[in-house]
Design a protein with these regions (language model features):
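Conserved acidic carboxylate
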Residues: 10
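Two-component/phosphorelay signaling modules centered on CheY-like receiver
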Residues: 13-33
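Acidic, metal-coordinating helix/loop segments flanking the phosphotransfer/catalytic sites
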Residues: 34-52, 60
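Short amphipathic alpha-helix used as the core "switch/output" element in two-component signaling
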Residues: 43, 66-78, 98
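Conserved phosphotransfer microenvironments
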Residues: 54-69
């Protein structure tokens, strides 16, 4: 079975470390890289194979994960994107669906919900 390459886009160090540890629990996945700014994700997708992105909605320097996800889906529609947030606002979920995000994960959810 091929190893799935996962890019993590999260500006908070503790959350980024947690997401990395969740991915490392999955035997057929590996962390392909981490970024603190969503606007750098599109460029990173062009540099090498990525299967899945765990994308925080609000990242460093007010970089918008939803806007980045929308651009990535235009150029790399095969890449799956899971939007990640701690903000329980319906407008984020609505926009994530509209731009084609594949899933939505709340940071307060158990890690099994992410990896399971």
């Amino acid at each position: 079975m091929a190893i799935r390459k996962i890019l993590i886009v999260e500006d908070q160090a503790l959350a980024r470390t947690y997401l990395c540890s969740c991915v490392e629990k999955c035997t057929d996945c590996e962390v392909a890289g981490t970024l603190t700014r969503a606007d750098a994700a599109l460029r990173r997708c062009g540099e090498g194979h990525i299967d899945l992105i765990l994308m925080d909605i609000c990242t460093e320097s007010d970089s918008d994960g939803l806007t980045a996800a929308e651009s990535i889906k235009k150029f790399y529609p095969r890449i799956k994107i899971v939007m990640v947030t701690s903000m329980l606002e319906g407008r984020f979920l609505d926009r994530a669906k509209k731009i084609g995000a594949d899933s939505f994960w709340y940071k307060d959810s158990p890690s099994g919900d992410l990896v399971g």
